[in-house]
Structure formats: C-alpha cells, structure tokens
Amino acid sequence: MNLSELLTQYSQRPDQSVPDWMLGYFKRYSISFADGKTDVLTNVCWLQSRNFTLDLRLPIRAQQVKSKPWEDYSVEELLVMADYEGWEALSEWDGELLKWCETDNSLQLHNRWIEPGILKRFGNCMIELSPSGAYVEDWRLQPSRPGPLIGLRLIEERNVETNEVCHKGGGLIICGDYAGLVLGRPQEINARQQYNALRELVIEAQGNSKKLEEYFKFETSVAKGSI
C-alpha cells in the first residue's frame, strides 16, 4: 500500500489535535537568549502534525561534515556531527503551552530542550517563548501548495528477508509540498552521563567503524516534493 492508497482508504482526523495554525513546516528565523545573544545561522526545521513534532537542527552548510567511511573521520569532525540534532516526540497543547512528551526518538542521548513552549501566531510568523524567559524563537511558516497532512509514527522497520530490525521508532510527516522523516536507532544507546553523552562516546570510538555506525544509525531528513 502506498501513501495515496492510504489517504483514500484510511484518511481520518484524530479527536485531539494542536490548533490548525500550528500545523505545517516552519523554519526558524532566529533565537534570542536572555544573555542578549541571537542566532540566525543555525538551520532549524520544525514539522508539526496533529499530535507529534519532527525537529532537525544543523549548522550552516559550510560547517557540515562531508560523508566518508567511518574510520576516516577525525575527532573534530565527529564532535561536529555529534552536535547535530534530530528528534521526534508526541506533542500536547493545553491552550497556551505546547508540551513535548520526553523525546521519544532523538539523535542526542539527552533532552536539550526541556521547557514547553508558549506559542503565538502572527501571519506566517509563530513566536515561541520559554516559560523561564531563557529564550524566544521566531519561526516562519514555509509557503506550500495545498496538499495532504499526513502524520505516521513508526513502530519499527524490519528487513523482511533477514528479520533484522533496521530502525525502531520515529515518524513521517507530510504537509503539502514538504516531508520530514525520523528513523530511530534499532537499539538503545545507554548514556553514561546526563549531558553531552554522544560527544563523549564518539571521542572514545574514533576509528571504530562498528561503534560509530551504531551511534549514528539515526536519520532525520527534510525534503520538498510531491507524493
């Protein structure tokens, strides 16, 4: 069954949902912190379905690491990659705050964004305030032709020939011209410390292809196109 058949035969709207003005694909225009600093360079994508969120955060393209065999990455390159962010989590709206359930699937081994968001929409701009006042984010809805809104959460992806679990957990969101995909790791990685655990692990694993593949066997992708 493909997505077009799924839409035709099983299209449904859940009983509970975030507001319609929160749905779609947003890119972050800026984040300003309480210390006065503002970041307008980091590439941040937010895709929102009725009940869950996909998030991707990458440095500017010039600072992104080029693909190569695992054993060829330097410690410096591994540390850049270990700072990438991608995650999927259930979201709950109470009329003022958007809360994310403890991040279900994340490249990082700890939750970097623990606060809920106070959200307000103005035209194509959505403002997110942290309740503590630590930061404010300016999100911009990306233009799109009318199209389907699909939100599917992944239980697991399994190789039908070998029965091997390739990915466990994640999700797919399609909203008009855009799509986002998260594929979780097949096995849980145990963090030995509360913060920056992934960075610590990749330093130790530098040159070890098997370990690095295990740590980075996680995907977050955003694309533009048509189903």
What are these regions (language model features)?
Residues 1-86, 97-227:
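Lipid interaction determinants
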